[in-house]
Amino acid sequence: MERPISEAYFQEAKRHIPGGVSSPVRAFKAVGGTPPFLVRGEGAYVWDADGNRYLDYVMSWGPLILGHAHPKVLARVRETLERGLTFGAPSPLEVALAKKVKRAYPFVDLVRFVNSGTEATMSALRLARGYTGRPYIVKFRGNYHGHADGLLVEAGSGALTLGVPSSAGVPEEYAKLTLVLEYNDPEGLREVLKRRGEEIAAIIFEPVVGNAGVLVPTEDFLKALHEAKAYGVLLIADEVMTGFRLAFGGATELLGLKPDLVTLGKILGGGLPAAAYAGRREIMEKVAPLGPVYQAGTLSGNPLAMAAGLATLELLEENPGYYAYLEDLGARLEAGLKEVLKEKGLPHTVNRVGSMITVFFTEGPVVTFQDARRTDTELFKRFFHGLLDRGIYWPPSNFEAAFLSVAHREEDVEKTLEALRKAL
């Protein structure tokens, strides 16, 4: 599939934008080649500047659970647009969307809207520290919570090693306030809680990991997380990716979690920039203007994003069968991928929860970040480009989830599997 216009755009973009992209994974650094410059989306498909059509499994990295350009979402945004772009003032739409969030997450009393998942997690951690008066946070390897300084850290050797920066520009002294543990290692978590629990403000975690590829929590790991409450540690469920995707109440509903705070994004904005952090009243009342924890934003709660999010959540709430449909379609795709890869004699593990799926090119099981890193990235490049050249747009990294939407059909799954047979 030829993309000369995209190639020209990419070369021009690199003269004006770092790496030619506004987010690193879009540059295809992990897979090589030229990213298609997309100009249109409809349903489960996107089109590039060269006129090529692709079946989309990126779906803007998760927000588009209804598919591209859903007519009801577009209509709500157009209606709102006619009244103005943004006011920097309270609006009825943010009240309506907050009420939807509370219906989806019954433990939530108060919701604060922001503009990105990074803002949501950063603000939730500041709130946790302000509420508890404690300095340390715990995160897990392979869990991504945005690009705030305190979260761009990785583990050293041993469960109690203080975090060290994984990005230039993050002071080591600041990174040391983050303790980084292995995901799905309940005993390691229990050890840290036993020795340092009273210093820890919060544990932030992805209930289902999406940014190391899909990783699924074990029951004992979830149990160990909830044991942290006995030490006065707040649990922050980062549902920026899983919120409203795995169920209307996200992974919290699906897995029966009991967090103190939840962070939301992606689907919450219906395709426009919106995110939120939310939780129990006694914690959220520490946020300004009610309390001493400061957080603000010029475009927070802006009408266009609130309108898109509200229309999306209304459709999800009114059509609970969407989640059963996505589970069935996801199961078909999972089974088909396993069948094709087995036919080809390739090492593989397919991890899936609902409409999130990852193919790892390694023998399973893949339950930790260390397991995920065993994947054969060269084989993934063949997989990715073989699909892309046949009109299937899979995420350009082996450590990202692929997403289904309600716009995908059974014939799209069959088209994907046939393309994979030819590609490999």
Curated annotation (Swiss-Prot):
A Pfam family assignment: Aminotran_3
Keywords for the protein's UniProt record, in alphabetical order: Cytoplasm, Isomerase, Porphyrin biosynthesis, Pyridoxal phosphate
Cofactor (UniProt): pyridoxal 5'-phosphate
Localisation per UniProt entry: Cytoplasm
CDD domains, sorted: OAT_like (cd00610)
GO-annotated biological processes: protoporphyrinogen IX biosynthetic process
Any GO molecular function: transaminase activity
Pathway field: Porphyrin-containing compound metabolism; protoporphyrin-IX biosynthesis; 5-aminolevulinate from L-glutamyl-tRNA(Glu): step 2/2
Gene Ontology annotations for the cellular component aspect, listed alphabetically: cytoplasm
Modified residues (N6-(pyridoxal phosphate)lysine): K266
Catalysed reactions, semicolon-separated: (S)-4-amino-5-oxopentanoate = 5-aminolevulinate
Enzyme Commission number, as recorded: 5.4.3.8
SUPFAM superfamilies registered for this protein in UniProt: PLP-dependent transferases (SSF53383)
InterPro entries hit by this protein: 4pyrrol_synth_GluAld_NH2Trfase, Aminotrans_3, Aminotrans_3_PPA_site, PyrdxlP-dep_Trfase, PyrdxlP-dep_Trfase_major, PyrdxlP-dep_Trfase_small
Quaternary organization: Homodimer.
Similarity field: Belongs to the class-III pyridoxal-phosphate-dependent aminotransferase family. HemL subfamily.
Protein name, entry field: Glutamate-1-semialdehyde 2,1-aminomutase
Organism the protein comes from: Thermus thermophilus (strain ATCC 27634 / DSM 579 / HB8)
